Each structure stands twice: as C-alpha cells, then as structure tokens.
Design a protein with these regions (language model features):
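Extracytoplasmic/secreted proteins, especially bacterial periplasmic and envelope-associated proteins
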Residues: 90, 94, 140, 144, ...
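Bacterial Sec-dependent signal peptides at the C-terminal "C-region" and cleavage site
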Residues: 1-4, 12-13
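A mature extracytoplasmic/lumenal domain signature
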Residues: 110-112, 131-133, 156-159
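Short pre-active-site segment immediately N-terminal to the catalytic Zn-binding motif
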Residues: 128-145
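Metalloprotease/metallohydrolase-associated module, dominated by Zn2+-dependent proteases
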Residues: 3, 102-104, 112, 164-219
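Short alpha-helical hairpin
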Residues: 118-127, 174-182
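Catalytic Zn2+-binding segment of zinc metalloproteases
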Residues: 149-167
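Auxiliary, metal-adjacent structural segments of Zn-dependent hydrolase domains
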Residues: 4-7, 18, 28-125
Length: 219
C-alpha cells in the first residue's frame, strides 16, 4: 500500500518575553556547552522511516506551527540531506560571544514570567533563556536569542546595557503567526513604549543576523 506520512508537532512555540524585573539565581553557561546540547536536540528534526507490522513504511517528521506539510519526495530528500542548522549555530555562537564581550550575563534558567522563553533584564545586565528552548533545537534557540539581543541593542540605544530600552526605529510589521502576540494577557499592563519595543523584536527576530548587527551598531 501507499506509505503513511505522519507529521508531528513539537510543543507549542515558546514566545520570548523581555524587559522583566530581576530574578535571583541561574547559572552561567558558555557557547560551546550550549551548542553541544543543541546538536543533540537538532536530531529530532531528522525525518525517519518506520516499518509497519503488516508491511509498508511510515514516514515520521516534525513540523513547526505554520509550516506546510511535506510530500514524500521532500521527506526522502531531507533524510538523504538532513538539516545541519549551520547558519543558526553560527548566529548563536557569534551572538553569545558578542553579548559576553558587552558584559551581559547569559543564563539558562526559568525567566520570571510564566511561559516566557527569554527575558532581558537591564538592571542586572542579564539575559535569561528557559532551558526548554534548548530542547527545541538550534532554530528556535537562535530565534529567541536574536529576539533578546534586539532588546539589548534597544538598551544600548538608550545609553548602555544598564539603560531601560528605547525603540530603534525598526520595521514593526508582525508576521501572520505573531499578529496577536501582543494581545496576550502578558502584555495587558504593557505601556505603549513597551508594546513598541516588543513589536520591534517580534517583527525582526527571524532576521537572524540582525541582532549582531544592531549590537555592533548601538553598543
């Protein structure tokens, strides 16, 4: 019979949050250690073929919310040439090192806000990323780190890493999947300025090289 194709969704995408109050605790981590953990997590994005008890084959692959379904030919092509996430890993390494150069402390720890993937705390010059983001692999981690790096650049624009962030004047057109993100309860008490800061970061987080450019320009 025809092969079965089974896409599986990872856990709901974690949305970065930023500019929260300080939270004690957390552990410093270095880039090589994180990249090592991400290399393991990236294996989940390799499609696999599973033999069925009655004969035939089932092809299983993971997809992110909003991604189109893959055809059998596309799945087989991915199995022959699995994603390396080399661009994402390079971005993570460069961003991480630049942030450390700027005196930013990076912690893999639970952010203060429930459900947050990441947060930038200028008062403590600390950037926190939820450990579960590592489990999602390099693509998601690069996106979250880039989002938070944009917030760091917003602080630099205001005078330095310890300054309260100010808008950079970036485009604020949100992609369809994030169109309602600022209507979540998390942002109920956000000021107009805070909404603008978040809109800038969300609208540009997919431009993975942008965070580093903004840090170099403003910090």
């Amino acid at each position: 019979g025809d092969p079965l194709i089974t896409p599986t969704l990872p856990a709901p995408a974690l949305l970065p949050r930023a500019i929260n109050q300080p939270m004690a605790g957390g552990t410093d981590t270095d880039a090589p250690q994180v990249l090592e953990q991400l290399a393991v997590a990236d294996q989940q994005w390799r499609p696999r073929a599973e033999p069925l008890p009655g004969g035939g084959t089932r092809y299983v692959y993971r997809k992110r919310p909003g991604d189109p379904d893959l055809s059998l030919n596309q799945i087989k092509a991915l199995m022959l040439n699995p994603p390396t996430f080399s661009r994402e890993r390079q971005v993570i390494d460069q961003l991480w090192r630049r942030l450390v150069q700027l005196g930013v402390r990076l912690e893999l720890t639970q952010p203060r806000k429930v459900g947050a993937a990441g947060e930038w705390d200028p008062a403590r010059v600390t950037l926190r990323i939820k450990p579960a983001v590592v489990d999602k692999g390099s693509r998601e981690f690069a996106r979250v780190l880039n989002h938070e790096a944009i917030h760091v650049a917003q602080s630099c624009q205001a005078g330095g890493t310890r300054a309260q962030p100010q808008p950079l004047g970036l485009p604020q057109q949100l992609p369809p999947q994030l169109r309602n993100v600022l209507q979540e309860p998390t942002y109920d008490r956000a000021t107009a300025r805070e909404q603008t800061l978040e809109r800038e970061a969300y609208a540009n987080q997919e431009q993975l090289e942008l965070g580093l450019s903004l840090l170099n320009l403003h910090c």
